[in-house]
Structures are given as structure tokens and as C-alpha cells.
């Protein structure tokens, strides 16, 4: 196969790397030689010091000789240190030059790759011409002319185009197809994986970014690594590449790179600040690594270090994390300079048009720059347009997206069989289930708030899992492990029957649960039964996680069970050595359960994978599982049926139906419904129930296809035998089965007499009631009460009441002295003072009001009472003004007042700065008659290459119109302005980028205004000096023009 011309540059960079390495080795050898020489010199000096002096006359001569030798050695050592320091400096310079050369080469490729991109996309479908109108503008300009010459190009242009096509044909650009895997890939790639590699190569050669969305378990990691291996082997491109993935999968990425392509040098960029500093300085150096593997959090924290590099490929695993374009992660990833972006996801694209646009915008921001245009293009205007929308979606996604299912490509992979195993409740579970429904009877009967119903649902699901999840349910202390751990939960009884059968046939088991505390119970059970196990949950560290996976997967491992939390253990883990998956409870989102199942059902699996989904019969879990199946059925219709509006959360009616489901059966009996059936019989019944549910879902899918594309259609509403359950009188069910709680009876004394009974009936004399102690109201510092004085009055009142009560208790006793006087009651004046002090404070102001007041002060300044009052709910302007006055005088009474005042002053400084900016812009614009056309900015050295003068002029004028800080409005103004309709660079800028450019322009304007003011002052000063130099001429002129008689007359008047 012919190599690309770029390979020469890559090989030259390899030679340069080798030279740098050789120089580094020489430097290290020289350092060792110097160390050895200095060490030997020291030994000689020490030996000379220790040698005895035999002749007293010869000693001074030897001393002089040694002094000269020491000076000479010191001079040599000094020169060597200087030389080594210079070598270190040269080494750093070489590394920096290498980094700059590497970045320049990547940037040059980045500029070249876009040339054929639109052409390639337009070959796929003409739809991209709609999104990339700007690229067509140039061709329209070329087509200007008259008559038959309107659409012709010149002969030179035609020849140049032919030459380019010939060159592409000779070099095979864009036509590479590998028949065998790269030789540096260890192991054997499957046919569909090689096809996936060829698809990635085609994207690379056409300058296109893509989404690899194969189903989980098909080897997306291997396909990605093989692409980097292809670049290394056939193109001579060693990187640098960056892989950004969830923290839990970094260990797997490093292992897979070492396993499949050990020639690629991978660096794991993770750890505490000290470890990261070491990696930055010693490992993350140009020429020393090919792949940087890091987490989402590290990419954000260490973005400065990572931005030093221009990357060949940025690969994002679990790419659905960037579907929100406004998230910090998505913004950070857009900052990195890269030739190509590859997104990897195992979950299907959700049927949300905006999230789909966000991914496409990340891949091709210059083409998919406008979400509004994208939404308009796929807007469904009528029932007949549905098929057209589906076709448009398919055409847009085809060049970027590759998604294949196991059933389509991996014929040799054993099938996966799912069985729902239903089990009853124990007596203890029924008691708790009934108590939970009775506790929130009003909400369950009438339908409360969604949040309240969701909480009830969660509690009921905990009860279905194990009653010991509730505080105080487990007998103890002391807590013991025994059969009660099994018999008190139906699912544990089922698990205890199932595991011995699986152990007999040499199966290995993964048990998933959403609840970490349930994993604790399962851990106790496994220890009780003597089963060896591993465990991973959200609190498991990275090293411990990798060690557990390795211990479970190693050949001959005796670990029988692997306990995993569904969320933490469902990503990036290969546990194909297991062949049974037990879902102890089901997630609301069925995709999460699928991810969990695919830990075992993946490439490398030799056995049929059995999935057992536990379900508590006649309880909320039946409805949860049913809903999950419905959602999976709908997900299959997402793109193929053009359904663009997704129901993401459970609505209130669904929750109510789930909570009520099975209530009648729970209340009708107290006894346990756990049967003694054999496990084989339970599995057979489960298979029947699963088949019935599959049939129901098939009918539901058929019904859903017939629905119109109408917002009012409820995809979760279908014909169901239990549809009328919401109409049951739930209150009646509870009252019919209600058992009054037993009354608390007084225990009988062991041997009681009639006299004692009679005495008891007569009763003891009533004790005097405890005095009602006045409770001091809770006084907060922000309410500005006189707390010190109120506390004094309160304590005085309490002392008097307690003293009075003590007197009453002791007045009938004998030989007991009366206590000393404890104080007097509050006087009328003190009572009035107390009431007045309570009214002086702001008792109606809550902590929330106080925080709102502080935020408003930061936003508007302490003096803008009207604006502050507009932010306060339930407070009049007069109340706010009164509070602001007291706050200004007594703010030092507040806890942490320094921080509060600093925040307010910082906000006021921002307001002041904003006013200064608006004045500076206004002053600048006042110097022009039409600033929208005439405004000029003195750039100096800050012109920049990205923004032109027309863009800067528009930006300044819009800030003057909209106000400083309204960046989203400024961004919208650029997007809607006809002036910039073809300027995709400006239209694709984020609000933060526009803000940074505005700040740069404002600094230039302020500097220009200062220079203008200085010139104005200088001009006024010169004018004033000129005026002061000319006045003497005016009187002389007037005096010369006056007649002698008028002069004589003025003299006469002055004498008078």
C-alpha cells in the first residue's frame, strides 16, 4: 500500500526524537562521569588529608601544592556545573522546539483537512448544502456573468482541478481499505471490527469527525486503538492523541492499549497534585508519549497543561456526557486544538433533537452552527411529512454515525436469555409495605405531589428488596448473621435457592443492585453461606477496582460471585468470565440495566448468558419493570419512526398507578406469600411470565407505530388489564382491612391485695403542674434584635417562675427551710421594654430574605433601594429601606461580617466598573456622526487575526445599546444580523469568547480616551497661554481710536 506524503514529515520528526533521546543519553553519561570524577577527587583529597607528614620541612611545600590542586579542581568543577547547566537549558530548548514543530505540523494538517470535507459530505447527501450556505457563496460569486458564460470556469482553473484529481487518484487519497489488520495489533480482529476500522480510516482521510456507537460489548475500544495503530504504522503519525473517559474506565483503557498495541506509549494523567506535577514535567513531554489517557475531571482541572499540545485525535468515551453544549465539560473540550474528534458511546442516541444537534455541533461546528436552523429543518408540519423527516435524519447521520448490534454482526456470540423471576413477600415485608401505604394514605388515595409520590415509591422498593434497609428493622444489637437474613425477604429466599444450582453447573454470577446498603446485606449473606466474592460500588478506589476485576477474571479464579452497584459497575468493565447476571432490582432507565448485562454478554463470552431479573409479585416492582420494557420498545422507534419528543421522567399519574398496584392483595392478608416451590419450577414460571410480557410489548410497539405525531399522544398509555386500578377506592380497601393497634395496658402487679387495688382506684394527690416557662424566641443576628438586653429580661422572668414553683412544692412539707429569694417578677416597665425590643427587630425576616438582600446589594449596590426591593418577595420598599438603614449602621453585629461586606463591595466595584465602561464607550461613540459605519479603533499591537474591524465595530455599538455584560443577547445579535450571515467564525463564538474580545476592545478604547483627553488638555492649555499673551493689544487699540476730548473728559471725571 502506498504511504501518504505526510509520512515523510512524520519520519523526520521521528529522527528528531531519536536525536533528542541520543543527546539525553549523552547528557546523562556526562553527568555520571562528572559525578564519578568529583567523587574520585574527593577521595584523593581525603586520602591526602589522612596521610602522615614525615618531614616537617617538606610539609609546607606539599600544602601549597595541595592548595593549588584544590583551586584547580574547584575551577574545573565550577566549569563543569556551568556546562551542565547550559546543556540542561539547551535540552529544554530542544524539547520546546520539538513541541512547537509538532504543533505547527498538526495545525497545518488541520488547515488542510477541511478543504475536501464539504465536497465529501455533499457526495453523501445534498442536505449539507442547507447547513453550509457560506461555502456556496464563493461559487455563486464565481458564477456571475452573462449568457452562456455565466457558469463557466477559466481554462487554468479547470486544469488545476484536473491535476488535483489526478494526484488524488495516484496517491489513493480517501480510498484506503485494509484487508488485514495492522501488524502492530496483537490478537485477531473480527471481520466487523476490521470493517469498523476501515470506516474510521475513511473518515480520517476525508477530514470528518465521527461517532462510533456500536452496541456495548462489540469492541469499540479495540477499534479505536487499531485506528491509532494504523496512523502509527501506515502514516508514520505517532500522536499525540488524547483519550478522555470516565475515571472508572481509565485502568481498562491503559490495559487494552498495552494488550493490543504495546508499541504505542500511553500516559495515564491522573492523581493528586504532586503526582500530576511529576507527570506534567517528566512524562507529558513532546516526543515522550503517544497517547494521554485522562478523566473528564482532570481534563477540566489540567486544561492549561493539556492546551500546550495540538492533538491529532481527541477521543471521548461515554460521549453522551457532552450532549449539553453549555456544560463545563463540553466547553472545556472545545478549547483544545485538535485535527480530529471521535466520540464513543454504547447507548443509542436519545430522541431529543437538541441533544443530537449538540453532538453534531461538537463534531462539525462550522457546519452545524445554529440550533435554530437545525430545529427548523426537521420541524414536522403535518402528518404526511413524517416519512420525509425520518429520511432527512438518516441522511444527516449517515456520514458520521456507525452503530451495529450484536445480533447483526457477532454471529458467533452465544445468545442472551432474560427471565423475570417473581417472588412473594415475607410477613415482615408485608407489615412494612402496609405501614408505608398507611403513613401516606392521603397522598396515595387522592394523589399528592409528584415528589411525595416518588418518595413513597422509593420506600416501597426498599421494602421489596429487604426490610433490613429500614432503621431498626434488623434484630439487635448484638447483630448476628443467620437464617433471619434470608427468611425475612422474598428475594433472599429466591437467591438462596438459585445460587446452589448455579454453583453445581460451574456458572459464575454477577449480582447488580442500585442500593449500596443492600450490597452490604448481600455481602453478609455470601460470608454466611461461604461463597467467595468480589465487590465494586461507587466508593471503591481505582486501584482496588482494577485488582478486584483482575482477581475475578484470572484463569482458575475461585471467586463465585461479583457484587456490583448498577451505576458504578455498569461502565467500562469486562467480566466475560461470568455467564449469569442477576438483577436484584431494576433501574427506572432500562439502558442502565442493559449496560449491566453487557458486562458479561460481550466479545470473549463462550457460554450462553442467562439474565435473571428479580421481581416482587403484586407490588410496585411489577409496574417498574413493565415501564422499563415499554421504554425499550419506544427507544427502538426513535430514529426509524422519527419520534423526536421523549418522555424522560415518570409523570404523577404513572407514579400513582405504580404505588397503588397490588395494595388490595397486601392488605387482604398478613401471611407470607413466599412459596416452597423448587427453583426449576420458579424458573419455568418466570419464562412463561417473560414470554407474556414480550408479547404484550410487541402489541404495544405495533400500537405505538400507528400513533400520530401529536404532542398529546401518551406513548406509555396502552390497553392493559389493570388500567382501571386508579379508579379503586383505596381508602375503602384500607378501612376494610384496618386493624386497630393494640391499646397499651397497665401491667398487673405480681401479688396485689384488695386494699392496694382500692388505693389505686382512689388515686394519689395530684401533683402541682410544672410552671409554663416562657420560651425565648429564636433570635438571629441578621434580625438585629438587642439580644443582650432581651436575654437579661428573659433570665429574670425564668428565675422568678422557678422560685415560685419551688415554694409551692415545699409549702406542705415539714422541717424544710424555705429557699432564699430568687428575684422579683418583671415590672410593668420591663414588660413594655421587652415587647418594644421584640418589635424593634426584624422578626419577619428569614435567612432566605437575608441572603436575597445580600445578593441584591451585590447586584445593584446598597444605595439602590428600589432595585433591591424588586428582588425581595413579600417585602415593601419601606420595609427594605428601614432594614437597609439598620444594616448599614449595625452590620458589624453579624457573624462573618468581613466576608459579607467584602462581597458587597466587590459587587459595587463591578457596578462602578460597568458604569465606567459604558461612559468610556459613550465618549468614544460621541466623536462620530454614524459610529455603526465610521467607528475606528486604534489597535496598536492588539489587532489579532480572528476578528475583523467590521465585527469589532458592531460589537462596541451593540454593547452601547444592550449594556455591558449581556453576552447572550450580544451572541443572538450576531446570529440574527444580516451583516454576518456568512461569517461562520463569528456566529459560532460562545458568549465567553465574545466577552473576552469585548474586554480587549474596551481596554483599547479607554487607552484611546486617555490619550484624547490628554491632547484636549494640552490644546486648552496652549489656547489659554495664547489668550494671556494677546490682551495688551486691545486697550492700546481702543485708546488710539478715542478722541482727545473724550480722554480729557474721563480724566476730569476720575478727579471728581
Curated annotation (Swiss-Prot):
Coiled-coil stretches noted in the UniProt entry, renumbered to this chain: 12-105
Residue stretches of biased makeup (Basic residues): 141-151, 1047-1056
Compartment(s) where it occurs, according to its Swiss-Prot or TrEMBL record: Nucleus
Expressing tissues: Highly expressed in growing tissues such as inflorescence and flower meristems, young leaves and floral organs. Expressed in roots, rosette and cauline leaves, stems, flowers, inflorescences and siliques.
Residue ranges of domain SANT in the record: 840-892, 941-1002
Mutant lacking the gene: phenotype: Reduced heat stress (HS) memory. Premature decline of expression of HSA32, HSP18.2, HSP21, HSP22 and HSP101 after HS in the double mutant plants chr11-1 and chr17-1. No visible phenotype under normal growth conditions, but the double mutant plants chr11-1 and chr17-1 are very small and display early flowering and sterility.
Source organism superkingdom: Eukaryota
GO molecular function: ATP binding; DNA binding; helicase activity; hydrolase activity; nucleosome array spacer activity; nucleosome binding
Motif segment (DEAH box): 317-320
Domain Helicase C-terminal: 494-645
Helicase ATP-binding domain: residues covered: 201-366
InterPro entries membership: Helicase_ATP-bd (IPR014001), Helicase_C-like (IPR001650), Homeodomain-like_sf (IPR009057), Isw1/2_DEXHc (IPR044754), ISWI_HAND-dom (IPR015194), ISWI_HAND-dom_sf (IPR036306), P-loop_NTPase (IPR027417), SANT/Myb (IPR001005)
Extent of Acidic residues compositional bias: 11-32, 60-73, 155-169, 815-833
SUPFAM superfamilies: HAND domain of the nucleosome remodeling ATPase ISWI (SSF101224), Homeodomain-like (SSF46689), P-loop containing nucleoside triphosphate hydrolases (SSF52540)
Annotated spans, Disordered: 1-80, 133-175, 738-774, 814-833, 1011-1056
Family, as annotated: Belongs to the SNF2/RAD54 helicase family. ISWI subfamily.
Subunit structure: Interacts with RLT1 and RLT2. Interacts (via C-terminus) with RLT1 (via the DDT domain), RLT2 (via the DDT domain), PTM (via the DDT domain) and DDR4 (via the DDT domain). Binds to FGT1.
Main function: Possesses intrinsic ATP-dependent nucleosome-remodeling activity. Constitutes the catalytic subunit of several complexes capable of forming ordered nucleosome arrays on chromatin. Involved in the formation of nucleosome distribution patterns. Involved in nuclear proliferation during megagametogenesis and cell expansion in the sporophyte. Required for the maintenance of the plant vegetative phase.
Protein name from the UniProt record: ISWI chromatin-remodeling complex ATPase CHR11
Native organism: Arabidopsis thaliana (Mouse-ear cress)
Amino acid at each position: 500500500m502506498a504511504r501518504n506524503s505526510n509520512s515523510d514529515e512524520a519520519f523526520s520528526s521521528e529522527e528528531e526524537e531519536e536525536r533528542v533521546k541520543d543527546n539525553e543519553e549523552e547528557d546523562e553519561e556526562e553527568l555520571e562521569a562528572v559525578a564519578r570524577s568529583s567523587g574520585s577527587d574527593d577521595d584523593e583529597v581525603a586520602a591526602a588529608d589522612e596521610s602522615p607528614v614525615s618531614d616537617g620541612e617538606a610539609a609546607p611545600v606539599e600544602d601549597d601544592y595541595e592548595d593549588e590542586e584544590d583551586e584547580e579542581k574547584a575551577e574545573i568543577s565550577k566549569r563543569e556545573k556551568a556546562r551542565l547547566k547550559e546543556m540542561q537549558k539547551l535540552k529544554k530548548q530542544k524539547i520546546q522546539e520539538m513541541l512547537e514543530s509538532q504543533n505547527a505540523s498538526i495545525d497545518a494538517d488541520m488547515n488542510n483537512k477541511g478543504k475536501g470535507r464539504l465536497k465529501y459530505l455533499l457526495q453523501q447527501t445534498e442536505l449539507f448544502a442547507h447547513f453550509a450556505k457560506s461555502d456556496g457563496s464563493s461559487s455563486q460569486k464565481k458564477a456571475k456573468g452573462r449568457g452562456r458564460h455565466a457558469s463557466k470556469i477559466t481554462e487554468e482553473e479547470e486544469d488545476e482541478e484536473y491535476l488535483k484529481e489526478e494526484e488524488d487518484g495516484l496517491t489513493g487519497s480517501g480510498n484506503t481499505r485494509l484487508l488485514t489488520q495492522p501488524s502492530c495489533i496483537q490478537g485477531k480482529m473480527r471481520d466487523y471490527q476490521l470493517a469498523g476500522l476501515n470506516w474510521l480510516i475513511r473518515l480520517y482521510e476525508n477530514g470528518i469527525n465521527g461517532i462510533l456507537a456500536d452496541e456495548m460489548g462489540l469492541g469499540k475500544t479495540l477499534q479505536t486503538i487499531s485506528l491509532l495503530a494504523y496512523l502509527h504504522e501506515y502514516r508514520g503519525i505517532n500522536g499525540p492523541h488524547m483519550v478522555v473517559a470516565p475515571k472508572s474506565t481509565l485502568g481498562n483503557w491503559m490495559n487494552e492499549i498495552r494488550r493490543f498495541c504495546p508499541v504505542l506509549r500511553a500516559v495515564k494523567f491522573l492523581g493528586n497534585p504532586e503526582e500530576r506535577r511529576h507527570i506534567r514535567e517528566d512524562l507529558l513531554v513532546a516526543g515522550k508519549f503517544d497517547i494521554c489517557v485522562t478523566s473528564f475531571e482532570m481534563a477540566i482541572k489540567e486544561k492549561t497543561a493539556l492546551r500546550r499540545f495540538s492533538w491529532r485525535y481527541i477521543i471521548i468515551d461515554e460521549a453522551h456526557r457532552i450532549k449539553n453544549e453549555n456544560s463545563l465539560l463540553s466547553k472545556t473540550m472545545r478549547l483544545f486544538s485538535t485535527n480530529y474528534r471521535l466520540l464513543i458511546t454504547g447507548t443509542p442516541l436519545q430522541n431529543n433533537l437538541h441533544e443530537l444537534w449538540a453532538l453534531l455541533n461538537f463534531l462539525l461546528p462550522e457546519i452545524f452552527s445554529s440550533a435554530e436552523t437545525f430545529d427548523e429543518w426537521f420541524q414536522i408540519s403535518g402528518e404526511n411529512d413524517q416519512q420525509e423527516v425520518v429520511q432527512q435524519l438518516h441522511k444527516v447521520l449517515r456520514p458520521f454515525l456507525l452503530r451495529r448490534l450484536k445480533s447483526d454482526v457477532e454471529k458467533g456470540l452465544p445468545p442472551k436469555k432474560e427471565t423475570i423471576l417473581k417472588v412473594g413477600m415475607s410477613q415482615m415485608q408485608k407489615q412494612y409495605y402496609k405501614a408505608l401505604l398507611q403513613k401516606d394514605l392521603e397522598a396515595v388515595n387522592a394523589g399528592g405531589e409528584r415528589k411525595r409520590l416518588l418518595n413513597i415509591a422509593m420506600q416501597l422498593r426498599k421494602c421489596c428488596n429487604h426490610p433490613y434497609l429500614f432503621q431498626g428493622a434488623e434484630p439487635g444489637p448484638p447483630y448476628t448473621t443467620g437464617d433471619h437474613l434470608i427468611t425475612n425477604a422474598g428475594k433472599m429466599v429466591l437467591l438462596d435457592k438459585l445460587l446452589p444450582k448455579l454453583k453445581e453447573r460451574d456458572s459464575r454470577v454477577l449480582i447488580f443492585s442500585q442500593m449500596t446498603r443492600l450490597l452490604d446485606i448481600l455481602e453478609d449473606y455470601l460470608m454466611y453461606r461461604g461463597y467467595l466474592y468480589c465487590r465494586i460500588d461507587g466508593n471503591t478506589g481505582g486501584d482496588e477496582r482494577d485488582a478486584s476485576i483482575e482477581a475475578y477474571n484470572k484463569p482458575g479464579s475461585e471467586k463465585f460471585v461479583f457484587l456490583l452497584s448498577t451505576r458504578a459497575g455498569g461502565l467500562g468493565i469486562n467480566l466475560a468470565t461470568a455467564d449469569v447476571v442477576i438483577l436484584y432490582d431494576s433501574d427506572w432507565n432500562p439502558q442502565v440495566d442493559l449496560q449491566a448485562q453487557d458486562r458479561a454478554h460481550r466479545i470473549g463470552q463462550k457460554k450462553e448468558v442467562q439474565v435473571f431479573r428479580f421481581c416482587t409479585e403484586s407490588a410496585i416492582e411489577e409496574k417498574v419493570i413493565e415501564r422499563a420494557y415499554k421504554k425499550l420498545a419506544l427507544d427502538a422507534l426513535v430514529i426509524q419512526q422519527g419520534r423526536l419528543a421523549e418522555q424522560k421522567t415518570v409523570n404523577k399519574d404513572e407514579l400513582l398507578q405504580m404505588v397503588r398496584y397490588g395494595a388490595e392483595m397486601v392488605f387482604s392478608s398478613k401471611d407470607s406469600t413466599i412459596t416452597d416451590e423448587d427453583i426449576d419450577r420458579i424458573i419455568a414460571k418466570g419464562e412463561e411470565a417473560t414470554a407474556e410480557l414480550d408479547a404484550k410489548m410487541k402489541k404495544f410497539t405495533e400500537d405505538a407505530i400507528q400513533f400520530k405525531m401529536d404532542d398529546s399522544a401518551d406513548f406509555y398509555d396502552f390497553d392493559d388489564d389493570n388500567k382501571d386500578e386508579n379508579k379503586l377506592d383505596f381508602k375503602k380497601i384500607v378501612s376494610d382491612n384496618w386493624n386497630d393497634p393494640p391499646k397499651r395496658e397497665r401491667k398487673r402487679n405480681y401479688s396485689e391485695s384488695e386494699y392496694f387495688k382500692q388505693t389505686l382506684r382512689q388515686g394519689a394527690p395530684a401533683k402541682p403542674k410544672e410552671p409554663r416557662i416562657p420560651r425565648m424566641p429564636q433570635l438571629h443576628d441578621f434580625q438585629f434584635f438587642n439580644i443582650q438586653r432581651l436575654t437579661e429580661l428573659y433570665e429574670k422572668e425564668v428565675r422568678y417562675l422557678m422560685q415560685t414553683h419551688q415554694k409551692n412544692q415545699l409549702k406542705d412539707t415539714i422541717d424544710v427551710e424555705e429557699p432564699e429569694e430568687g428575684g422579683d417578677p418583671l415590672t410593668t416597665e420591663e414588660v413594655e421594654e421587652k415587647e418594644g425590643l421584640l418589635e424593634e427587630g426584624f422578626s419577619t425576616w428569614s435567612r432566605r430574605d437575608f441572603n436575597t438582600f445580600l445578593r441584591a446589594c451585590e447586584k445593584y449596590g446598597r444605595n439602590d433601594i428600589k432595585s433591591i426591593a424588586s428582588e425581595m418577595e413579600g417585602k415593601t420598599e419601606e420595609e427594605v429601606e428601614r432594614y437597609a438603614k439598620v444594616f448599614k449602621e449595625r452590620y458589624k453585629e453579624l457573624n462573618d461580617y468581613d466576608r459579607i461586606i467584602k462581597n458587597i463591595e466587590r459587587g459595587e466595584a463591578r457596578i462602578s466598573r460597568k458604569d465606567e465602561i459604558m461612559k468610556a464607550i459613550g465618549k468614544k461613540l460621541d466623536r462620530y456622526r454614524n459610529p455603526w459605519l465610521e467607528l475606528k479603533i486604534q489597535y496598536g499591537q492588539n489587532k489579532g487575526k480572528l476578528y475583523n474591524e467590521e465585527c469589532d465595530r458592531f460589537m462596541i455599538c451593540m454593547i452601547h445599546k444592550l449594556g455591558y455584560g449581556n453576552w447572550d443577547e450580544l451572541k443572538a445579535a450576531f446570529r440574527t444580523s444580516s451583516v454576518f450571515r456568512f461569517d461562520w467564525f463569528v456566529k459560532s463564538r460562545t458568549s465567553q469568547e465574545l466577552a473576552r474580545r469585548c474586554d480587549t476592545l474596551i481596554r483599547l478604547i479607554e487607552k484611546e480616551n486617555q490619550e484624547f483627553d490628554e491632547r484636549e488638555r494640552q490644546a486648552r492649555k496652549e489656547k489659554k497661554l495664547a489668550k494671556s499673551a494677546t490682551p495688551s493689544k486691545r486697550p492700546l487699540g481702543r485708546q488710539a481710536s478715542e478722541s482727545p476730548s473724550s480722554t480729557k473728559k474721563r480724566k476730569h471725571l476720575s478727579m471728581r
